[in-house]
């Protein structure tokens, strides 16, 4: 009776080599597809479990601990505050520039022809 893996000293056939290669390539492609792409914004908030869960289902909810939840809410509040501050600054600049301002033009004097007198001849 032969062992379950086949004969011991027999080399692999071409078909078996191709099948092994196919399985290896397919598994590599699957790993690439399931890999989460994107930079981790905040290492304190995102853990490897979150990334794993994102890979399996992008729509799944992620449970956060109280500390991480507070930190995330604080980040959102600060972002909204900055956005509101930027919106307030933008209209103030536009109102000032909307009114036409008179341009001050420099007066350029036309060069006048001046007759140069020879000082040597007079003396």
Curated annotation (Swiss-Prot):
It holds the Pfam family DUF5564. Residues 18-33 have a biased composition (Basic residues). Residues 1-33, 82-123 are annotated as: Disordered. Transmembrane segments: none annotated. InterPro entries: C11orf98. This is Uncharacterized protein C11orf98 homolog.
């Amino acid at each position: 009776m032969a062992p379950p893996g086949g004969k011991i000293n027999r080399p692999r056939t071409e078909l078996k080599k191709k099948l092994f290669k196919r399985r290896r390539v397919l598994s590599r492609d699957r790993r690439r597809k399931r890999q989460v792409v994107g930079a981790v914004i905040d290492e304190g908030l995102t853990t490897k479990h979150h990334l794993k869960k994102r890979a399996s289902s992008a729509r799944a909810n992620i449970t956060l601990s109280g500390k991480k939840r507070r930190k995330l809410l604080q980040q959102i509040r600060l972002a909204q505050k900055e956005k509101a501050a930027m919106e307030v600054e933008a209209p103030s600049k536009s109102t000032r520039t909307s009114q036409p301002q008179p341009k001050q033009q420099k007066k350029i004097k036309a060069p006048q022809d001046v007759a140069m007198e020879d000082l040597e001849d007079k003396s």
